[in-house]
Amino acid sequence: MDLEQDEWMSQRQRQQQMEFSRIGIEVIGSKKDLIVNSMKNHETTLTIINETYRIVYYDQYESKFTSCNIITFDGKDKRSIKKMKRVVQKLSNESTNSSHQFDLHSHALLQSSSSSSSSSTSSSPSLTSSPSSPISTSPPYHSSPQLLEHLLHQQQPITSVGSKPSFFVIINLYNDDRQSYMSEIVSFAGSFQFIEWRNDESWKEVFKLSSNLLTYHVKKNELARACTLGDINLLDEIILSGCSKSQLKEAQGAGYTIVFNSYTSYSSGSSLVVSGTMALLCAIVENGTFLLLSKSNITRFPMSIINMCSQLVELDMSNNRITEIPIEITELKFLKNLNLSDNLINDIPLEICNLTLLKVLLLNENPLNNFPSSIVELGTKKLLSFCRNILEGKSCETWNKVKLMFVGEEGVGKTRLCKLLIGSKYNKKKSSSSSSSSLSSLSSALSSSSSSSSIINSNSISNSNINMVNIKNENQVTGDTVSTEGVNIHDFKSKKVEFYAWDFGGQQIFYPTHQFFLTTQSLYLLIFRVNDSNFAERVNYWVHQIKAKSGISLPIIFFVGTHIDSCTPEQLSMAESILKSNFIKYSRVKQNVINFVSCVTGKGVKELKKRLIHESEKSRLIKKDIPGSYIILEQRLSNRGANQGRMSISNSASNSSSSLLNSSSSSSPSLTSKKSSSHLKHSQQQQQQHQQQQQQLQQSIKEKYIDYDDYLNECKLSYLKPHEIKDATDFLHNLGIILHFDSPKLNNLVVLDPQWLADVMSSLITFSHSWIKLGILNHSDLQSIWGGRYKQTLWPSLLKLLEKFEVSYQLPNLSKSLIPSLLPDDPIGEILEIKDREWVPLKLAMENNYVQVFGCDYHFSFMPLGFFARLLLRILLIQGIDIKTYWKDGVLLDILTPSDKIKQQQLLQKKSIFEPTTTLSPFLCSLSLTDSQNYSPLEPPPLILNSPRVNRKFISNSTSTTSTTTSTTSTSTTSSNNITPLSMSSITPYSPTSPRTPSFSSSSTTTSSSSSSSSPSSQFCGVGCHRNINKNNGSSNELIKTLTKINNQNGSSGELIKTTTTTSTSTSTTSTTTPTTTTPTIPIKNNNNKKLPINRTVSSLCLTAKPKLQALITFIKKKSFEQSHDNDSYKLNIQVRTYNTTIDKEHSVSLFFQQLLFTIDTLISGSYQGLEVTRTIPCTHCIQLNPTIEPYHFDLGDCISALEDGRSHVYCGNDPNTPVRIDYIAPDICLKKVPTFTDDQILYERQIGEGGFGLIHKGKLISNKSDIAIKSLILCNSNNNNNSNNNNNSNNSNNFKNNNNEDEFIEKFQEFQHEVFIMSNLNHPNIVKLYGLMHNPPRMVMEYVEHGDLYHLCQDKERYASLGWTLKLRLMIDIAKGIGYMQNQNPPIVHRDLRSPNIFLKSLDENSPVCAKIADFGLSQQSVYSVSGLLGNFQWMAPETIGVEDESYTEKVDTYSFAMILFTILTGEIPFDEYSFGKMQFINLIREENLRPTLPFDCDPRLSNLIQLCWSTNPKKRPSFTFIIKELLEIRIDSIQTSYFDSPFLKNYPASI
């Protein structure tokens, strides 16, 4: 084994030897074999000038090329004395001759160079002895490129023309008994170095001396070569590798000799060209103060200048190819003038401000991609001040860029007005291309001014006049308009302000995407046609759209009326009056915000400009106190694509992908300046430049957006501190430089080019193509939409990007995408058929008394377009539902009952009967929760749509196909959503009509005979059923029989198996349903508790005794401005129906209703914070009396107040004598499963705690004397709750409503109800039990845990010190079991507030059944797919839950918090107490820098690894609690065993036992 290892090592050593270049040393003399053989057995590598070599020692007869000589002598041979004399004499003579040959060689080289450059050297500055004149450098290779290229590319050996260095090795072995003549031999060595070889270790001295001689020799030759060629880069590399000043002085002397010999012998002029290398050597050796290295082809800043020229006062390095200024330049303390112009520098280090004597810094003609050129243009003093302010953390820079938003309806003149403000003429013929181009920047306008008549020289908004061009009046009066698709961005400047003008497309189809571009810190121009009789309605929409985006602060809105040429003074006066009375209140600015202009004559435009500039200054849109790092960040991002116009993409469909490259190339920043590029004439340099440009071009094309981690790196490179990043991001977002959203789907994305994003969005939803039918896009049609615009390889990425912005949703397993904004406005075609078939008219349902109805209405003062499209996608993710159909403003669904889920499980178990016999119609789909959880919120659950060429009915070779369907169910552990996609059958185009919006007050269209007799669940199959319908009816009938048998086996004798027979022909479609059993009559209680028989005279939907739960959610939009004060102008209507059952029996209804309301509230609070929202509840008594009229609506607060007053009902406003049960109209706020206690059943003892939620008392249940804890909700500032007397704890909830805001009252009660709801569904020994609740005030009666909480235990150091290691592990295990139980719920429970105060200790005996329990579920949520919200207690919270308001997260946040609890149990300390940062700094360090507590050094390695896994920054890396519990149990078992075997008892026990 050892031999094999030695052989492997030898092979490895030989392989490594071959990787290095070799330097040979010739060994001469009688003892050469000893030296050669010994040195071969040792590692002999060395590094010379950043290159590694291996020294190889050769015998003189091996005829290898060598660079050094070793001459050996036998120290115990007297003849060696004479040999030494002869050798020394010969070497001395060769040294003299080689020196002369070296001078001749260098002289000849310089002569060849000088003779070919004599014509150009005359123009170079002369070399003088005056100290005030810097040494001029103009390397000879500039004038003789052919010679230079030859010299640079030739392969020269590492040697010189002169003799090789030599040294002596005298063998004087100690184990040799002969007489030594060492002293005599050495006496004749003279100046030559020698080594005495005594033993085997002497090889080290030989190698050391060999290395030193070779290094010196190579560096000497390379110095000569660098000086001869004028290669400053090589000279700098040599100096930095380690050259003594004596070596440099020697090189300088040799260089001067060559230069002056050349001058006296060959130069005919009076001036002398001195190479840059000689100038640098002179500055180093003579400690010079001036150095000029211009035009020296330097590629990097020579660090030798910084290290060895500390006295420099003036440094000129212009006209080179330097790419970076080193931070170490600040070592040049005496530097006053620094010229770095005409290089390739991209950034300037802030530390340059430490050059306190610097007066002149020239940086012109540099790319400066990562440093604001505007600062450089202000001069050296301002630049240094700018850098110093950033380093010192000062915020004193001015930002004069203002985002100007042009909004309004289509055809009002936004684009024309924008061009007039820019200062350009308007050309009708060019308008189309101008509007379709992705961006018109000022620079492009100026560059084309000579060839385009539509551009004029005026390019700024200022107080000076602007040239206007008259456009024929008829163009405007006749309605000749320019259409902007999506958003176009322009920019125009004045001396005081630079506007970024955003021109929003006015077509309604683009409105849903506008929300991503509206920002708070903007100046809005709301443009409308004064001669439009309905202009108030148009203005009203945009005013509320802007207000909704601005939140609580009022935006700055200028109202600009156009087309005044065709208006009378009376019309203008009336328009102004309407604006003042209705809309001016929504603008922060009240004066001079109403403007009337003419885009034909330019009337009013000049005044509008002045007002915009004035208001920008007055309203502080021009910032004068921002950090300079913001400006650097903007510059860096602009370099990557955030600068508008840098990477424009043509909208012309005819453009090829190559034109995209060309257009991007023309707008990309140049890698070299114009001056420096003129010197790069060599083919290799040009090729390198071309490759760099292509590389940057490819990068610029890709970087339309970057991920957030990349953005954070840019922030770090911009000198932003972690706590400044959010403010900087918001600042640039509000200005429109970038787009970044804190929403769960978009927080990891930073859009660098908003114009590009607008183009991508508009290209998909534009009105100019008709490829998307009924909201469904076939990916095969993308060629017609994106072909020529974007490379086909980018299409999948673009689709994913649009999914993030909720514009499109790619349907899994299909090459199709859903475009919600392009869904039909109203139910039409098959959508209408499904709706009419599944949703029985309310009047008919109520007349037959087989249905119970409840719901609620959300009333909005305004709602932007696109709201319901976003809500729809969230509804699709709610579990336990079966989507029937949907359209733009509505969705119809079934709510799955427990029996449905049981049957689905049985269907899954018997899925073998559904062996595929033919292809299933493509519209059939199913989705389980397990599948949906594999999709992120960015990827909606799988939806399957049928082909647009296939009718929605079953298609077969025969004329009819019979199919059987069952209710959608799920397994016992997962719920399912069956999502019915829209039909893609051939439907004739439709014209939008008035909305068909079902509500409680209107009856639906009477169901046709065919639809009323069809099955409610027709055309759907269960989850996981790969069901296929045979082409013959026989097989289908067998399938029906099998399904019937399954249902009968399930005990559902009263249920129906519906058989749907569908006949597909070109002209007609029929459907029949045949019941298989007789359905008994089931009585249902109405609100008055009267039993009402169910009439079986309605459709087959109602004939079955099987309970059925349905919901219809619709959105009603206002029709006109006159309806703006109507409560139903914007209303979200939710209607839920239960057939053949009651709300009391089917808790699935309440659960769905709670999840639906939570989904709606989350969307509104996250994306529509500026809206006024109220929620009302319709009276079911009114609906039962007359479903055709509007019912009375209860206020939500009234229902809550009634519950708190102990009343189970409220009274109808239309019939005050009729009580209505609250649990029937608002089951979400009633928790009927939870027992209720009264005051006479509870005995209060003392207060034991207090928190933000309320007070906690210890008490007893009077019935069994058991200890309890009572948690009370604080509803007022009264101290009554502190009293132990039961009577004093009662409180009138109305007092709260009278003294506090009603919204706060509702919010607190809902939080209380939420915690009760969560706890009522938990039953685990490691979770504090809920016994019941009390009203007036709201209270929870819970299990009492006697040993207090973990926090106070750790604060008591004596108690904590008494905890044994195995007890600590037991506490960890108990807590892990409790959390694991919560995460195994369906859906999982996210506690969100796990910390030591919420961990209670049941026992401190590790052998007790229970030691620790989890409590306080006030912040808990059921994770449908993720939850969101900003949390406190940052020490315990996961990074994704702190610092960002709308960031989403899953149950993995509790895993992170559990790691902090483990740390607390392990150390007794609060996490992060070891640090002393501020809260915001803590949050940023935790989120961005992965700051974590320090684990004890003696922590068990397995526990340490487990904790680090649990607090991983990436939630996906955090382990499951199954794994966590297993690991903790193993650690505890090992600890117990170790403790047992280490016990004194075992140690003293006889070893034989």
From Swiss-Prot:
It comes from the Eukaryota. It is an enzyme of class 2 (transferase). This is Probable serine/threonine-protein kinase qkgA. GO terms for molecular function: ATP binding; protein kinase activity; protein serine kinase activity; protein serine/threonine kinase activity; protein tyrosine kinase activity. Residues 395-619 form the Roc domain. Residues 1242-1546 form the Protein kinase domain. Disulfide bonds: none annotated. Its EC number is 2.7.11.1. Residues 648-675, 683-696, 956-1018, 1059-1090 have a biased composition (Low complexity). LRR repeats lie at residues 287-309, 311-333, 334-356, 357-378. Belongs to the protein kinase superfamily. TKL Ser/Thr protein kinase family. ROCO subfamily. ATP binds at I1248, G1249, E1250, G1251, G1252, F1253, G1254, L1255, I1256, K1271. Pfam families: COR-A, COR-B, PK_Tyr_Ser-Thr, Roc. CDD domains: STKc_MAP3K-like.
